[in-house]
Amino acid sequence: MKSKTSFFNRTVFKKNVTLYWPIWVCYLLYGMVKVPGQLWSRLQQQTDMTAYARDYALYNSLRLEVDVAAIAIMAVVCGMALFGYLFTQKNAYMIHALPVTRGELYVTNMISGLCFLLIPQALVFLVTVVLCLLKGIASVQFLGLWFLSVMGIAFFLYATVCFCVMFTGQLFALPVYFLAVNYVAFAFSSGARYVIGYLGYGLGMDTVPEFLILRILSPMNYLYNNVRFVFRQSYNQETDLMSGVLSYRGLRVLAAYVAAAVVIYLITYYCYKKRRIESAGDLISFNWVKPLFRWGVGLSLIHI
């Protein structure tokens, strides 16, 4: 009788949840303070509970700029914890000697990390919905957009972390690789514009074209600037009242990054299947990447 092929191991998943519970608990506490906690505090400070005051308090609680940074930090921490066995040879050999396939390990750790990120977000969303209903805030559709946004951002950034994990065998190189992947294109673009603007007579930085593809290849910066809530305020002199319109932009950008994340997860799965166990402890885990790394560092130093 053939044994069934599995891509998920309950024992490993349970171990991840129980061993690394401080990670998702800390993220849950952050979410509770940042969204429902801040919203409740702002509403309590209002003496005149107008529609403008409610929407403005909701806008400040749902701002995604802080969430992008928080999700990035949590994604890196999850990657360092869940794939930590790949960074020491003793643990790498021990884990891969168990009756668990690499596919099971990868998928289980991937799902574990996503659960650490998405479940706290879901709980924060539910608590905030209840708070909005109790306080008479009708714009709950923006809570749904916030929830979709943080889920999409977490899904993509954790894919980037998993991808970076496969290319290094050192624990503290992971956050460096993650930042490099997210900002190297932006750094080269900004540096090139600065150099051209500085050396080109009569040229300013604003006159040098900025290519869209380079901005897209800097995901954190692009998400930070293009997936957000906007609150447009206006003042009516006749009624002496402030009014505001809350809106959201960036859903298509988010959908594109989520689609890219699916591809990244599949590529990472293939890389894990090909990764050498003995590369644990190496700065770069694939030999064919080492020349590219040297050239990249050299060009970066010249650029600086």
PLM region spans:
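Aromatic- and glycine-rich beta-strand/loop motifs that create alpha-glucan
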Residues: 1-27
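Conserved small/polar residues in nucleotide/adenosyl-binding loops
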Residues: 302-304
